[in-house]
Amino acid sequence: MAKAKEVKAKPIKGEEAEKLVYEYLRKTNRPYSATDVSANLKNVVSKQVAQKALEQLRDTGLIHGKLYGKQSVFVCLQDDLAAATPEELAEMEKQIQELKDEVSVVKTLYKEKCIELQALNNSLSPAEIREKIQSIDKEIEETSSKLESLRNGTVKQISKEAMQKTDKNYDFAKKGFSNRKKMFYDLWHLITDSLENPKQLWEKLGFETEGPIDLN
């Protein structure tokens, strides 16, 4: 038995085509080009007729169109957008672009923090940082004691050059301590960011501070 031939729908154009294209966009609520619309409607509306219908619908404010490269893409406006003025639509696009820019900044910041964390992980472990801090604390304490004795004249006087060198060494050690201390706390906050009680871990590890700090 011969297979029945498929009856092709008669191509349409004009207002009938515009109505069909609009109903299709409204129903699917997705962005399409003229080529997509023509193909999805089984060529009942040709590509050229679809393009003309889409442009007409855009000009009347029923749909929104935007050029991407060499191809225009159209999407049906929702009820609240259909009533929007060109100025309001422009403001919406501006806000969307600002949000995209903010997302880009956050992504860049996230990558930078990941690199910093990786660098910290590759340099010193928490135990090594603690040991370094203790060593620097001891060095500063000894240097401070010697410097205080020199300033009070309780030991044999030394030359001005030697005093300046001692002050320079002290400042260098103090700066090194501050830098390592900051690096340690940065690492601490990165590691404990997801913990509910960082202070409990701090006490368990036996860390000490010179004064009150925010461990959370």
Swiss-Prot record:
GO terms for molecular function: double-stranded DNA binding; recombinase activator activity. It is found in: Nucleus. The lineage of its organism: Eukaryota, Fungi, Dikarya, Ascomycota, Taphrinomycotina. This is Homologous-pairing protein 2. Required for proper homologous pairing and efficient cross-over and intragenic recombination during meiosis. Acts indirectly in a process facilitating homologous recombination. Acts during mid- to late-horse-tail period. It comes from Schizosaccharomyces pombe (strain 972 / ATCC 24843). Its main location: nucleus. GO terms for biological process: homologous chromosome pairing at meiosis; meiotic joint molecule formation; meiotic strand invasion involved in reciprocal meiotic recombination. GO terms for cellular component: chromatin; condensed nuclear chromosome; cytosol; DNA recombinase auxiliary factor complex; nucleus. It holds the Pfam family TBPIP. Interacts with mcp7. Belongs to the HOP2 family. Keywords: DNA recombination, Meiosis, Nucleus. Signal peptide: none annotated.
